[in-house]
Amino acid sequence: VSKNVMPSIVSITGKFETTSQSWFGQTQSSESEGVGSGIIIGKKDGKILIVTNNHVVADAKSLSVGFVDGKSASATIRGTDSDADLAVVEVDTKNMKSSTLKKIAEITLGDSSKLQTGERAIAIGNALGYGQSVTGGYISALNRQVQLTDKTMTLIQTDAAINPGNSGGALLNSKGELIGINTVKYSSEDVEGMGYAIPINTAKPIINKLIKNEATSESEQAYLGVSGQTIDSSMASQFDMPSGVYVQQVIKSSPAQKAG
């Protein structure tokens, strides 16, 4: 199954510029690189269309997509939906070698409404940025309400390993059909093996609108543009600092930066 699907899976590398502020108010800019995965869902107007997570590509200065043959090409964002954590990026076929075009393939979509717990599941993606990897497991639960930083999402839960870099990759059934888009892994000292994916039936109408460059929601999710660390009472005591949230980074051009 995985061998047949590999031509549909890509790696996505983004370059990001962030600004951070020291305790003394000094602002510094730095460039970082992030990696994720994507799934080839079609071709339109000479462009290869790829779905991934919004958090993989949001605010990227530039994007590069790596294909199954190891070749890569620059990509641009076609549309994003931060509420659904989905994005469609495109690669101009003019920037791709003919040999690569012959080796890639469009993924086959499944029907996530027919899933049952205990069913086999396969996760494919660019785990840890090391290239394509395959992990197997089962559908652990359906319609899980998962609380993320700024939203609640209804997701598929699986014990197939979803590691950093797998975001935007494929969750497949035993037929090799796309049933979900890997998005997050729950990790703690007490819990292992809890990965989550956006059901493909939830994603399809949103993806179609993104391809057409149509608005996907009436209003965007409120967005501040900072990353921080929660300082709980034990950390506050250890480091002799107040409890609360310590702002570590302010994203360039975000509402937080514009507000000063």
Where are these predicted regions, by residue range?
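Serine-dependent protease modules
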Residues: 1-235, 242-243, 252
